[in-house]
Amino acid sequence: MVSTSSPTARACAKYVRMSPHKVRRVLDQLRGRTYRDALIMLRFMPYRACEPITKVLRSAAANATHNLGLDPATLVISQAYADQGPCLKRFRPRAQGRAYQIRKPTCHITIAVAPQNTADES
């Protein structure tokens, strides 16, 4: 369990060229896991979203180590979410002079880590 008064370290990746729905699919499986378990899970998941999420998770752990002096072995993912970013708009030419709009979504990935409680509450 993660205590509410414990220090947390965050990391964000902005304007990632990926749909937030596809990123949330991975983040939902990581929320509440330990840092090491999350890294192992990300390594073997078959999704493209795992690469940027791994980078953000490592950055959050580095922030916790450098800024707060926490041990990475005790870290738990307290928050993990993906917000929608701006859509890049492109146009595909179609018949008779028409054009269809193609939206290329982006997202902002945020992960926060906190030290794990020593007293586990069931």
Curated annotation (Swiss-Prot):
Query: Could you confirm whether the keyword Membrane appears in this record?
Result: no
Per the record, the GO terms for biological process are: translation
| One Pfam family, short name | Ribosomal_L22
**Endpoints of the signal sequence:** none
| An annotated GO cellular component | cytosolic large ribosomal subunit
Q: Which UniProt keywords apply?
A: Ribonucleoprotein, Ribosomal protein, RNA-binding, rRNA-binding
Q: Which GO terms describe its molecular function?
A: rRNA binding; structural constituent of ribosome
Sum up the protein's function in the record's words: This protein binds specifically to 23S rRNA; its binding is stimulated by other ribosomal proteins, e.g. L4, L17, and L20. It is important during the early stages of 50S assembly. It makes multiple contacts with different domains of the 23S rRNA in the assembled 50S subunit and ribosome. The globular domain of the protein is located near the polypeptide exit tunnel on the outside of the subunit, while an extended beta-hairpin is found that lines the wall of the exit tunnel in the center of the 70S ribosome.
Q: How does it assemble?
A: Part of the 50S ribosomal subunit.
The record's similarity note reads: Belongs to the universal ribosomal protein uL22 family.
Its protein name is Large ribosomal subunit protein uL22
Q: Which organism is it from?
A: Thermosynechococcus vestitus (strain NIES-2133 / IAM M-273 / BP-1)
| GN (gene name) | rplV
